[in-house]
Amino acid sequence: MNAWMILAAEAVQEAEGGLFDLDATLPLMAVQILVLVFLLNAVFYKPFGKVLDDRDQFVRGGRQDAKARLAEVKALTAQYEQELAATRKQSQALIAEAQTEAGRIAAQQLAEAQREAQAQREQAQQEIDQQKAVALQALDQQVDALSHQILDKLLARA
């Protein structure tokens, strides 16, 4: 065990120096750090930054595209609503016109039917009057004939 203590004491005496020894270790560590920084920058940070920039551009492009499409959709919606309102007005005008035309046609047909009915009634009245005149004339003839027969029978009895 003494041998180990002696070796440890010699090692402590040989490692004399302050906090910073100016030997080749310090510049070598600085070179290693610079090489590590350049390697990390080339291998990791630049590609990672490029991916982030590409993603940011993609998101911005998507947003701009979405805004443009939204504006287009709003414009088309407004246009379609205007066209729909115009079409509704036209259809209402057509319906009103059709109703007016149907009313006019119905009134014409009703007037025509009334005229035809009046004409048929007048014709029937004329036929009835003619038949009445014929019947009255036939009755007058029969009355005359019966009156002559009655008169002849009365005169024949007397």
From Swiss-Prot:
Record-stated family: Belongs to the ATPase B chain family.
Pfam families linked to this entry: ATP-synt_B
One CC-aspect GO term: proton-transporting ATP synthase complex
Gene Ontology molecular function: proton-transporting ATP synthase activity, rotational mechanism; proton-transporting ATPase activity, rotational mechanism
Topology with respect to the bilayer: Single-pass membrane protein
Transmembrane annotation, as ranges: 24-44
Taxonomic path: Bacteria, Bacillati, Cyanobacteriota, Cyanophyceae, Synechococcales
Compartments, record wording: Cellular thylakoid membrane
Protein task: F(1)F(0) ATP synthase produces ATP from ADP in the presence of a proton or sodium gradient. F-type ATPases consist of two structural domains, F(1) containing the extramembraneous catalytic core and F(0) containing the membrane proton channel, linked together by a central stalk and a peripheral stalk. During catalysis, ATP synthesis in the catalytic domain of F(1) is coupled via a rotary mechanism of the central stalk subunits to proton translocation.
Biological source species: Synechococcus elongatus (strain ATCC 33912 / PCC 7942 / FACHB-805) (Anacystis nidulans R2)
Keywords: ATP synthesis, CF(0), Hydrogen ion transport, Ion transport, Membrane, Thylakoid, Transmembrane, Transmembrane helix, Transport
Disulfide bonds: none
Protein name from the UniProt record: ATP synthase subunit b'
InterPro entries the UniProt entry points to: ATP_synth_b (IPR034679), ATP_synth_b/b'su_bac/chlpt (IPR002146), ATP_synthase_B_chain (IPR050059)
Oligomer status and interactors: F-type ATPases have 2 components, F(1) - the catalytic core - and F(0) - the membrane proton channel. F(1) has five subunits: alpha(3), beta(3), gamma(1), delta(1), epsilon(1). F(0) has four main subunits: a(1), b(1), b'(1) and c(10-14). The alpha and beta chains form an alternating ring which encloses part of the gamma chain. F(1) is attached to F(0) by a central stalk formed by the gamma and epsilon chains, while a peripheral stalk is formed by the delta, b and b' chains.
